[in-house]
């Protein structure tokens, strides 16, 4: 049954059927060909998969991100980044990375981060001497910090599938997210030296204070969200609702960047994005059930045990597998498909579930930067008007440093685990 589902899924994917329907249709048709599985499981899984309190956080965070973007958050975050890192070698490239880090704490989505920040800063990078391909790659890699630095929609879905603590996984993403940002900045610095791209004038203390004052309300939002979750004042789902109210009040009454007439359009955009995400969750739920029914995780464990008993080597093998999967399947879908398969495998080897979850999320996110899927990369290429050949020359250096950081996380799990252990 599972083999039929796999084959049908890839056939539908190849002929251009959207991934949510590819997963759902492939699994449904596979169920109908089996005498062992009741068709009732289809309705049960479709309903139960999205009838989840934790998944209610998705529409809330989608909406809060749209409200904050409409409220002029991007411009204010850019001003903060310019004030603090604009003078460094590479100038606007460093500002782009800094802004993406700040925006990641608001959006929780790679596509939202990339589109919002890239639209403003990719043209600026090009005007400051960055080649088209390099500007596109910098923003694609920096924008992909959205699902790693909390809040993260990918992490919320992973935890809803596996039962892990959303708060712990959020905390685990902080330090690796900053380390990856520093890695991206290091490669950007080397390219800036090569192309002789200098920094801007160093901001005065007064200019830094002014930038912080103007953007303070934007920066405070992730502090409220994460602080509330960690302190136990509210759940991740409730934090999403609070984020919506906060973003609405700030954008409508304080920043006054949008009016009441703009709200329906913002809500519709968030609803469309939420619907897409939940359709993928529902479609993948039948597939995930078939994976468990056919005992695929147990089969994988028995194969891997025959290869090695070293958990670090197993992690590296799983990362290679995830890189391959992430190149062909969009990050959210890949997470839903492989999390139920690989988490039991990691548990068999005594790998910390939070560490494994974080490594999986990071690997799938950055595998998704590469062609042929390359969602965020194609967004930035469109903004930069860059061709694929202009991008491919710069991509390996950035992905190389990120893969090194992933390997570091495998061998030094304390990098990701120290903060959740300190807080929880």
Report residues per predicted region.
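Alpha-helical transmembrane segments of multi-pass membrane transport proteins
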Residues: 1-424
């Amino acid at each position: 049954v599972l083999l039929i589902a796999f084959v049908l899924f890839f056939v539908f994917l190849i002929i251009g059927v959207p991934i949510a329907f590819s997963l759902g249709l492939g699994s449904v048709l596979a169920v109908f060909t089996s005498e062992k599985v009741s068709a009732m499981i289809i309705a049960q899984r479709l309903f139960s998969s999205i009838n989840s309190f934790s998944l209610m956080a998705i529409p809330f965070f989608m909406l809060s991100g749209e409200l904050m973007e409409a409220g002029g958050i991007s411009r204010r975050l850019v001003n903060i980044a310019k004030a603090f890192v604009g003078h460094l070698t590479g100038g606007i490239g460093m500002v782009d990375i800094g802004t993406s880090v700040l925006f990641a704490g608001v959006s929780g989505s790679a596509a939202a981060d990339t589109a919002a920040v890239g639209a403003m800063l990719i043209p600026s990078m090009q005007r400051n001497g960055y080649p088209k391909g390099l500007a596109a790659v910098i923003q694609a890699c920096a924008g992909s910090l959205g699902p790693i630095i909390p809040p993260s929609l990918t992490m919320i879905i992973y935890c809803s599938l596996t039962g892990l603590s959303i708060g712990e996984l959020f905390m685990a993403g902080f330090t690796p997210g900053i380390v990856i940002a520093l890695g991206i900045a290091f490669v950007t610095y080397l390219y800036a030296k090569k192309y002789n791209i200098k920094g801007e004038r160093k901001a005065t203390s007064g200019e830094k204070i002014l930038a912080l004052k103007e953007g303070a309300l934007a920066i405070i939002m992730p502090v409220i969200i994460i602080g509330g979750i960690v302190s136990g004042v509210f759940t991740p789902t409730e934090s999403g609702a609070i984020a919506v109210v906060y973003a609405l009040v700030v954008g409508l009454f304080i920043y006054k960047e949008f009016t009441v007439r703009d709200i329906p359009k913002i809500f519709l955009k968030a609803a469309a994005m939420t619907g897409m995400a939940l359709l993928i969750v529902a479609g993948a739920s039948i597939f995930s059930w078939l994976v468990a029914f056919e005992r695929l995780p147990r089969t994988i464990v028995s194969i891997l045990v025959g290869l090695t008993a070293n958990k670090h080597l197993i992690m590296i093998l799983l990362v290679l597998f995830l890189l391959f999967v992430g190149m062909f399947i969009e990050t959210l879908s890949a997470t839903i498909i492989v999390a139920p398969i690989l988490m039991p495998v990691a548990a068999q080897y005594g790998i910390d579930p939070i560490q494994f979850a974080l490594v999986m999320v990071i690997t799938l996110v950055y595998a998704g930067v590469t062609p042929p899927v390359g969602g965020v990369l194609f967004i930035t290429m469109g903004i930069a008007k860059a061709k694929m050949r202009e991008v491919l020359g710069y991509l390996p250096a950035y992905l190389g440093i990120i893969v090194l950081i992933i390997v570091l996380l495998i061998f030094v799990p304390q990098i990701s685990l120290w903060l959740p252990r300190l807080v929880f």
